[in-house]
C-alpha cells in the first residue's frame, strides 16, 4: 500500500576514499565497514568498491567523499558524490 502522506525514506549516505578518477564524471570509491564474526565475535574489516557520479570532476585520488544513493545513472553507478570531506595532500 502507498503511504497517504507521501513520506520518503531518508537518503542513504556513506563515506569513502577515492581510489580512482580516471573515468569521465565518475570516481571509484573504496568503502570500508566492520562486521562481527558470527562464531568468534571478532570485528573484521570488509571493503567494497563503488562507482559514484562526480559531475564536475572535482575529486582526486586520496580524497574522502560523502556519497548518497540515487536512481541508477548507468549499469554500475548508483551513487552520487555530495561533498568532499577531506582533500588529499
UniProtKB/Swiss-Prot annotation:
List the GO cellular component terms.
cytosolic small ribosomal subunit
InterPro entries, sorted: NA-bd_OB-fold, Ribosomal_uS17, Ribosomal_uS17_bact/chlr
Question: Per its record, what are the GO molecular function terms?
Answer: rRNA binding; structural constituent of ribosome
Q: Does the keyword Metal-binding apply?
A: no
UniProt family annotation: Belongs to the universal ribosomal protein uS17 family.
Function, as annotated, reads: One of the primary rRNA binding proteins, it binds specifically to the 5'-end of 16S ribosomal RNA.
Q: What's the protein name?
A: Small ribosomal subunit protein uS17
Origin organism of this chain? Xylella fastidiosa (strain Temecula1 / ATCC 700964)
**Which gene is the coding source of this polypeptide chain?**
rpsQ
Amino acid at each position: 500500500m502507498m503511504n497517504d502522506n507521501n513520506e520518503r525514506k531518508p537518503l542513504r549516505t556513506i563515506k569513502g576514499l577515492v581510489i580512482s578518477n580516471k573515468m569521465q564524471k565518475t570516481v571509484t570509491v573504496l568503502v570500508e565497514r566492520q562486521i562481527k564474526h558470527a562464531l568468534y565475535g571478532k570485528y573484521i574489516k570488509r571493503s567494497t568498491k563503488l562507482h559514484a557520479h562526480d559531475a564536475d570532476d572535482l575529486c582526486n585520488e586520496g580524497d574522502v567523499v560523502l556519497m548518497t544513493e540515487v536512481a541508477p545513472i548507468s549499469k554500475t553507478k548508483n551513487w552520487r558524490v555530495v561533498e568532499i570531506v577531506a582533500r588529499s595532500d
